[in-house]
Amino acid sequence: EIADTLEYIIAYPYWHVPNRIAVEEVLVKAKKDSTYLERNNFDILNSKREILDPKSIDWSKMTTNNFKYSVRQEGGSANSLGYVKFIFPNKYSIYLHDTPTKYYFSYESRAYSHGCVRVQHALDLADFLLENDENRYTLDSIKSFIDRRKERVISLNHKIPIYIYYMPTVADSLGNIIFYEDVYGLDNKLIQRLVSYGKQ
């Protein structure tokens, strides 16, 4: 459960790859394919946030334990966050974002994200938020930043409450119980806690 406020929009965002994804996915693919990083517009950064030449790294010696670099994906059409993301600062580093993989929205089950929330019509959402925010920036502004390939943070004048709940079981307006797929596997944990509590 997250209850927070949507505070700003980032146009043409970088994707700062979480460490777990960097070592479990990007590192594995980079070791297998020397062109992977360049083809997918990934930068490797040191602790000073300086971009390194991937060829200067001995990838054969890199492991999940000694990979001490940061990974960042350049903005653009292939960026995993698409052209825009929506930030509501929270301890889980979860946000809403555009996506280049629009075909996922045609699937009945769409839980393919690493944890953040993909938005099907992200530019439309940005347009709606800015228009109702009476913001000096507009959808045309965002498109201009995209065309110029420039990351830009756009603060909202009016912060918007946002609530995210995970409820694989709900009741409809008629009182019927509806069960959805427990994509995060939390039902079993809850059942185990209830059983343990009942034995006390």
Model-assigned labels for residue ranges:
Residues 1-200:
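Well-ordered beta-sheet/strand-loop patches within structured domains
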